[in-house]
Regions:
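Short acidic-hydrophobic, aromatic-tinged amphipathic segments that line or gate anion-handling sites
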Residues: 1-7, 178-183, 303-308
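N-terminal Rossmann-like NAD(P)+-binding subdomain of aldehyde/semialdehyde dehydrogenases
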Residues: 1-119
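Flexible, glycine/charged-enriched surface loops at secondary-structure junctions
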Residues: 98-103, 225, 262-267, 287-297, ...
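Conserved small-residue-rich beta-alpha loop and adjacent elements
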Residues: 103-169
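Conserved NAD(P)+-binding/catalytic subdomain of aldehyde/semialdehyde dehydrogenases
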Residues: 173-263
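A glycine- and small/hydrophobic-rich beta-loop-beta segment
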Residues: 258, 266-337, 341
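C-terminal core of ALDH-fold dehydrogenases
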Residues: 317-430
């Protein structure tokens, strides 16, 4: 852990620098796999699944029998927990629905906007040591609410050719229309181009390692949208003497266990709290099953002391954290003043884990400073805003002259003529 006291603002950028890795060698691998999947479809997918996941898959699509077996193997306790989380996520995302917006901008000119679902959605769900079935809820629930009629899910199989049962259970519960045993670069490529088994989709969502991240970025060159740029998980906590050191330490560790490249930062106006949190981290770290991973992240963590809350807020907005926890006497000051954060957690009893699982907000959030210009996943992520206009004769008369003048000024005479013909027809019809 690195303690930093009263850093000058011109040092903030270097102090808050995210862990970065070169992707040049990764890009070459990603392009090679994309090219092969585009040409050979399922054959290429099977090849790379065997190479990277160590298993030969006869049938890529998960069968109904496999889903039924998974459902039976998930404990009642976990099913109940997933049900509660799904209920809260559903409530919060249904509330995000917007009504049709309609305006008569001038007499005879009616304009309106409607949200329409993206028809084909692809979800990528990592497996491995932390199978993120919670991400299925975060992505499939709003996709279903939005009305997406094809929800495709890809997740890597284990050595026995099986996807984690909790992932299958959540996918079935949340209306996923097709589940496929494919992970990594080949999964993103398959959803980008489409194969014999994997449908081509219009937008891809979901987390992943560096290979998946670069693959998603490459997919955009082939007309596929993605949820957002992705990077290692991160958390910034602002806390004062009203915070509970054990709680603060537990939240920092909850992010640190995601990966060695996760970034966790504490900003405080209290040196006493910083020391107490540092001590608590060491105590809690020793009992974590994933402590080897968490220790690497914690070694690069920052414990930053600043003189006052105004400086703290400026630093936080400069950083733009994925997750931002406020444990301060002046929580309104921070919650009203923060402009750059993916999701905000307020108070001693609002752990970041709540947003990860069951409070109802979405845990798919911008990292790597993208909270300055990207939103986290929400209902609108699965829709497009379409605009409509309907103009009467009176309406074209009211705006026609302005259109003619503007079109002529831009040298677009066919644009002008499209209006002139209509105005003349109205005039001649009188």
């Amino acid at each position: 852990m690195n303690k930093i006291y009263n850093p000058k603002s011109d040092t903030w950028t270097s102090i808050l620098e995210r862990p970065t890795k070169t992707v040049d060698d990764i890009e070459a691998t990603v392009k090679e796999i994309f090219n092969e999947v585009q040409k050979k479809g399922d054959t290429a997918v099977a090849k790379y699944t065997s190479l990277f996941d160590g298993v030969k898959i006869e049938t890529i699509e998960v069968s109904k029998a496999e889903i039924a077996l998974a459902i039976a193997s998930v404990s009642i306790e976990l099913k109940e927990a997933i049900s509660l989380a799904k209920s809260n996520i559903t409530k919060f995302h249904i509330a995000q629905k917007t009504e049709r917006i309609e305006v008569e901008t001038i007499e005879g000119v009616k304009c309106w906007q409607e949200k329409r679902p993206i028809q084909k959605i692809g979800l990528y769900i990592p497996g491995g040591t932390a199978p993120l079935f919670s991400t299925v809820l975060m992505l499939a629930v709003p996709a279903e609410i939005a009305g997406c009629n094809e929800i495709v899910l890809c997740s890597p199989p284990d050595k026995n050719g099986i996807i984690n049962p909790a992932i299958l259970y959540a996918a079935n519960l949340c209306g996923v229309t097709k589940i496929l045993k494919v992970g990594g670069i080949q999964a993103i490529a398959a959803m980008t181009f489409g194969t014999q088994s994997v449908p081509k989709v219009y937008k891809i969502f979901g987390p992943g390692n560096q290979f998946v991240t670069v693959a998603k970025q490459l997919a955009t060159q082939f007309g596929v949208a993605i949820d957002m740029p992705a990077g290692p998980s991160e958390l910034l906590i602002v806390a004062d003497d009203t915070a509970v050191p054990a709680f603060v330490a537990s939240d920092l560790l909850s992010q640190a266990e995601h990966g060695a490249d996760s970034q966790v930062i504490l900003v405080s106006t209290s040196k006493k709290l910083i020391d107490a949190v540092e001590n608590e981290i060491q105590i809690q770290l020793e009992v974590l099953p994933r402590r080897a991973i968490a220790k690497k992240s914690i070694a690069n963590s920052k414990l930053i002391f600043v003189e006052n809350d105004t400086i703290a807020l400026e630093l936080i907005n400069e950083y733009g954290p994925e997750h931002f926890i406020i444990c301060s006497e002046f929580d309104d000051f921070y919650s009203n003043g923060v402009y750059n954060a993916g999701s905000v957690f307020i108070g001693n009893y609002t752990p970041e884990s709540a947003g990860d699982y069951a409070s109802g907000t979405n845990h798919t959030l911008p990292t790597n400073g993208y909270a300055k210009n990207y939103s986290g996943v929400n209902l609108d992520s699965f829709t497009k805003a379409m605009t409509f206009q309907k103009i009467s004769q009176k309406g074209i008369q009211n705006i026609g002259k302005a259109i003619e003048i503007m079109a002529e000024a831009e040298g677009l005479h066919a644009h002008k003529n499209a209006v002139t013909l209509r105005l003349n027809a109205i005039e001649n019809g009188k």
